[in-house]
Amino acid sequence: MANYTAADVKRLRELTGAGMLDSKNALVEAEGDFDKAVELLRIKGAKDVGKRAERATAEGLVAAKDGALIELNSETDFVAKNGEFQALADQIVAAAAAAKAADVDALKAVKLGDTTVEQAIADLSAKIGEKLELRRATYFDGTTETYLHKRAADLPPAVGVLVEYTGGDTSAAHAVALQIAALKAKYLTREDVPADIVANERRIAEETARNEGKPEQALSKIVEGRVTGFYKDVVLLDQPAVSDNKKSVKALLDEAGVTVTRFVRFEVGQA
């Protein structure tokens, strides 16, 4: 008896881009363990596995002000374009900056006029007739640079980047914010990547190389090369600079005398 459902197959196909048969086989091999099935498809080379699996379903916007960055979600893009919804987001991010609210729970409790942020969201949700959610919020108290990106001209910003830095000038910091928005770095340095994630990438790289029939004596070099490629995908300082791909982001920052201390990237609909 199958230990997975048709819905599991459909979800796995949507998340990974794999075909129906490959998805079924992965679920069988994983004995119904969904996360294991995703990993098996990665090893076997399914297109875009991992990247598509990060997606979540949501609409809404991101907003930034004076070291604060928030993501406010709606159910539809129709509401995301609503003037009252956008005005509320502006009020919330201003309140976040003023209160230096570093997370969602802290921000929900912040006063907004005669009410709280949490109640203001609930009130507008009841008025519009659609679920609204303050999904993410952060605040950096150092020198910061922000960048907001729209997916379409008639929609509010869907990608927001907040960078905290020291030294240099705003042009270098702005270039880094653009870099993070475009290439989706997750970590600042290699040391910031959790050891279990690196170990898993190394294991997947080795199993993939073996499945490809690579010679045993070459495996170590191949694995290290693929792990280095993984770092270039997810570590900001290791990434090739968008403005000059012959240099790393670290090299360009060193030239500009800028040190990035931390950053965050919010994208509507992204896990």
Swiss-Prot record:
Q: Which GO terms describe its molecular function?
A: translation elongation factor activity
- Where mainly found? cytoplasm
Question: Which keywords label this protein?
Answer: Cytoplasm, Elongation factor, Protein biosynthesis
**What name is this protein filed under?**
Elongation factor Ts
Concerning InterPro entries, the annotation shows: EF-Ts_dimer_sf (IPR036402), Transl_elong_EFTs/EF1B (IPR001816), Transl_elong_EFTs/EF1B_dimer (IPR014039), Transl_elong_Ts_CS (IPR018101), UBA-like_sf (IPR009060)
Q: Where in the cell is it found?
A: Cytoplasm
* Residue span of region Involved in Mg(2+) ion dislocation from EF-Tu: 76-79
Q: Which family does the UniProt entry place this protein in?
A: Belongs to the EF-Ts family.
Q: Which GO terms describe its cellular component?
A: cytoplasm
For this protein's source organism, the top of the classification is: Bacteria, Bacillati, Actinomycetota, Actinomycetes, Mycobacteriales
